[in-house]
Amino acid sequence: MHTLVFLSTRQVLQCQPAACQALPLLPRELFPLLFKVAFMDKKTVVLRELVHTWPFPLLSFQQLLQECAHCSRALLQERPSTESMQAVILGLTARLHTSEPGASTQPLCRKHALRVLDMTGLLDDGVEQDPGTMSMWDCTAAVARTCIAQQQGGAAEPGPAPIPVEVRVDLRVNRASYAFLREALRSSVGSPLRLCCRDLRAEDLPMRNTVALLQLLDAGCLRRVDLRFNNLGLRGLSVIIPHVARFQHLASLRLHYVHGDSRQPSVDGEDNFRYFLAQMGRFTCLRELSMGSSLLSGRLDQLLSTLQSPLESLELAFCALLPEDLRFLARSPHAAHLKKLDLSGNDLSGSQLAPFQGLLQASAATLLHLELTECQLADTQLLATLPILTQCASLRYLGLYGNPLSMAGLKELLRDSVAQAELRTVVHPFPVDCYEGLPWPPPASVLLEASINEEKFARVEAELHQLLLASGRAHVLWTTDIYGRLAADYFSL
């Protein structure tokens, strides 16, 4: 939906040279819509000039590229255009190399207005991208190049020094880009372009390099640290965690492959684990913790008891949890605050079922997102859990992929979920009815790799669709797609 104001703005930008000449004459209240239209339509000349002459202290992608009164399209839910992103960066560069942007034509109130360029919140879904769009990796590289070029570019034009601009970004780094990003962070110190990282994701990065980057980040800006595929173990984590703990405003910590299994204790391992726990107790603002693929069997109470405040998002995928871990979590202060819970890869079919049901009961009032992929839940366990599951009245997302459920079990789930008015997405498994010669109970690996009878599954999809229509729930997405943009990030809940 576009308003007349939007359509008029789009028409004004058709001739970019004329639009640029008109910018000084336009009321600054039009600049936000001008920016959105120029970004959407790839009007790169206008976009560059808008950034160059921006009349407000803040230019925020999250504010400008969302759905608005004039345009229902939310550009933040799409990958950004490479052309538009480059135009924004060029506009910033031009501003920094001009002591008084547009001084000859701009009203006095517009001079030096921009103080913060907030480029955070861009889509980062990890799926295959259109070649004309920019990934978070590309965005990191582009901003890093700008920082380095600003430092190496020599003196600005004669006159007063440029007013510094803080650039807030979400950074992605791996082995290949580490040295480049480190140079950019160093270059931004004392530079008119100050790089400020909100969310850091480091993949396959050695321990010493991770520490070096953390030391360069502003302690007041960082909101999330996400360390992936680093296989740190407790020893590596005990080296890194004190550098993470200095970020007192950190709200999200995502770690993986932390081995603290009490079944194979060692003196060094226990010392490292105790040190890790002590450092975790330093966080005062932590609301999300992800410990995927970490052996936490029988240790969850030690981990969560150290935290100063209740978590709202907890991801414990493939952590080999024991019944006592689930019982502790159900009784802990965290349960009543959980909005997002991921227990994927933990066997919930046997002695863990009752403790899991207790946890679900304890978090029913707040839970919005529940991920139970590959938890070995068959029809019997699902049906026994449905009375509690349907009490999660605010639940929006339910992930059940990789569980041995039949068509009958899925239909029962669909019928019972009608009472959950907020439910929007159910990621369900291929029903066991659609496999040929399936062993029982089927291992998760078989469910993920075995061939599906496409004709049977087509009938299943048609029947589920008819049931959704009949129950007035056609707006709810039932899908087997685990790679789509369905799972919500904690900060978007």
UniProtKB/Swiss-Prot annotation:
InterPro entries assigned: Leu-rich_rpt (IPR001611), LRR_dom_sf (IPR032675), PRAME_domain (IPR050694)
Gene3D superfamilies: Ribonuclease Inhibitor
Compartments reported by the entry: Cytoplasm
Chief location bin: cytoplasm
GO biological process: negative regulation of NF-kappaB transcription factor activity; negative regulation of toll-like receptor signaling pathway
LRR repeat coordinates: 111-146, 194-218, 219-246, 247-282, 283-307, 308-339, 340-360, 364-391, 392-416
Record SUPFAM superfamilies: RNI-like (SSF52047)
Keywords: Cytoplasm, Leucine-rich repeat, Repeat
Signal peptide: none
GO CC annotations on file: cytoplasm; cytosol
PANTHER family in the cross-refs: LEUCINE-RICH REPEAT-CONTAINING PROTEIN 14, SIMILAR TO PREFERENTIALLY EXPRESSED ANTIGEN IN MELANOMA-LIKE 3
Known role: Negatively regulates Toll-like receptor-mediated NF-kappa-B signaling by disrupting IKK core complex formation through interaction with IKBKB.
Assembly information from the UniProt record: Interacts with IKBKB; disrupts IKBKB-IKBKG interaction preventing I-kappa-B-kinase (IKK) core complex formation and leading to a decrease of IKBKB phosphorylation and NF-kappaB activation. Interacts with CHUK.
Family: Belongs to the PRAME family. LRRC14 subfamily.
Protein name: Leucine-rich repeat-containing protein 14
Organism field: Homo sapiens (Human)
Lineage: Eukaryota, Metazoa, Chordata, Craniata, Vertebrata
